[in-house]
A protein has these predicted regions:
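Conserved catalytic alpha/beta core of Sir2/sirtuin-type deacylases, generalized to analogous enzyme cores
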Residues: 1-322
């Protein structure tokens, strides 16, 4: 088990132990009650932390994409109806998450919805918060760790700069896990979308994705759709981020957390807290539109800005003169 995966495993045990507390939106960690300065000073301090860092580990989660318009996962937003309107009208679905886990009457309908979901993220342009973040990171030694499966970071950076530890919408896997391989989902998804036309809600039998080895139905290589394949590609993601952290442990690392919610704090947030505490020169910066969680143990090494992530990143970029 890699260094970072071991950290995640430890925090998952913590999550299980305090499950009810987490479900209520809380945390078992003792939080800081340190007063925040004025807004402009918060932005200035964040820009200073970024400027002074030798290296930055970005932890990008769902709130980052939501801030740029990818807010159709859990809410019936305009962006949801734009992409999934036909399914909302016919089935009463209110968000992409609900549709992804719906018990569909046929696999043809299921794949019509999943193809629409995957196509929406695969073809989405780079969202504004990601562009501002990219500008902020220019000239810095950085690495990206993400639980997002929407490929936004992959549209900006090469594979060796990003660890996607929860999967990627560009790939399929075998539902039976008969093989360790994942394979391209982009072209099959495109064909399914073409078959749907303007108003259909079911794909033909021959377009339902299947494993090229055993013929079993495939599903997206993302955690949550079933038996998530934690094979070679998955292990490579943890190896990349573990290697990067170990190579930079003695430097002034800034752990930059963006948009972590309360469903999966064990993948980015809590490991970042633990690493900030453990590394003598490390600092922690979180930007979140809802949650003001800064552990008391790192209150002198950390900062949380509560606000619109898109707005905060733009203001930090401007403060940096970029």
């Amino acid at each position: 088990m890699t260094f970072y995966e071991n950290l995640v495993t430890q925090t998952q045990q913590n999550y299980s132990m305090y499950y009810q507390l987490y479900q209520q939106g809380g945390t078992p960690y003792q939080m800081s009650h340190k007063a925040k300065p004025a807004w402009e000073e918060q932005i200035r301090q964040a820009a200073k932390a970024i400027s002074e860092a030798d290296a930055i580990l970005v932890g990008g989660a769902s709130g980052l994409s939501a801030a740029g318009g990818g807010d159709f996962y859990y809410s019936d937003t305009p962006s949801f109806y734009q992409a999934f309107g036909r399914f909302a009208k016919k089935y009463g679905i209110k968000n992409a998450f609900e549709g992804s886990f719906r018990h569909w009457d046929t696999p043809n309908e299921k794949w019509a919805f999943l193809a629409t979901f995957l196509y929406t993220t695969q073809t989405a342009p780079v969202r504004e918060p990601y562009k501002d973040l990219d500008t902020i990171l220019k000239g810095k030694d950085f690495f990206v760790l993400t639980t997002n499966q929407d490929t936004q970071f992959m549209k900006l950076y090469p594979e060796d700069k990003v660890a996607e530890i929860q999967g990627d919408h560009r790939f399929f896997q075998c539902s039976r896990q008969c093989t360790d391989e994942v394979w391209d989902a982009v072209e099959p998804v495109k064909k399914m979308i073409e078959s749907l036309g303007e108003d259909k809600t079911a794909v033909p039998d021959e377009l339902i994705p299947r494993c090229p080895h055993c013929g079993a139905e495939a599903f997206p290589w993302v955690r949550g759709y079933g038996n998530f394949l934690e094979g070679k590609k998955y292990q490579e993601q943890y190896q990349k981020v573990s290697d990067w952290i170990e190579q930079h442990a003695d430097k002034k690392i800034l752990f930059l957390e963006l948009g972590v919610g309360r469903i999966t704090p064990m993948f980015i947030q809590e490991p970042f807290w633990n690493l900030t505490l453990a590394f003598p020169h490390a600092k922690y910066l979180s930007v979140n539109n809802k949650y003001d969680f800064l552990p008391e143990q790192i209150e002198d090494k950390g900062q949380v800005i509560v606000g619109d992530i898109a707005k905060v990143l733009k203001e930090i970029r401007q403060d940096l003169g970029k």
